[in-house]
Amino acid sequence: DKVNGQQVLEMSGDDAMEFFRDQGYALQLAQQQQVLRLFRTEFDVWYSERHLHDSGAVERGFAALDAAGHTYDSDGAKWLRTSEFGDDKDRVLVKSDGEMTYFASDSAYYVDKRARGFDVNIYLLGADHHGYVGRLKAIAACAGDDPDFNIEVLIGQLVKIYRSGEEVRLSKRAGDIVTLEDLVDEGGVDAARYSLIRYPADSPLTLDLDLLVKRTNDNPVFYVQYAHARISSVLRHAADLGIDGQSAPFDASLLGEERERDLIGVIADLPRVVGSAAELREPHRV
């Protein structure tokens, strides 16, 4: 239901805080979804952490871990025995004051996803969360799964951005940031997608904003787009001549250049490369 300004003014402090929290959550989620649509990235499911708590999934997750004998109480807090499965220490699920930790949600979310039929759970973490890998795998082990199969963790590295030959200094605290939307606005969605996917996720990445908009072969995005345009032109010319690439006879003797044979080999290998890229979560291979 819509709430007018007067109703907001008449709310108690707690009600007003909850109202603005809900409004802020809805606004930020809508912005994130809009930017991802702009970036041509689609998620089949958007799962809220709030739903995890409201649906009882956290309690069900705790119950499953309790039943497996992997939780215990100490100093008024609830712990998970992650150190028995490779983590450097046990982790707190519920603090002594009753507040749940982030790790509690992570644990419950894993148990909930497995209950919903997801066999492999892929986590994409920032470079500063490398220490989280062990505890995520320990969650899988505590749930009776194989951490090496049921958990995949991809570690993303930092992105440096250059403009006019100088690094753009970023600071979240000062509000000096370059968003994904800014990147798309500067160079276009194709340039942004290609630039971010060109290297492995675990490699540091440098983006030159000036280079992204150059229409020269120095710009790898332009080079790929130019190659695509030339190939499309060849196919249109062949169609104008009545040549059907699917059924026309193939005369291999016309391919006398070594580069031509190499190119055919690369094209023939493309299905294997695409399959390997998907299996290894490494789209830069394509």
Regions found by a protein language model. Name each.
Residues 1-286:
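Non-catalytic interaction-recognition regions
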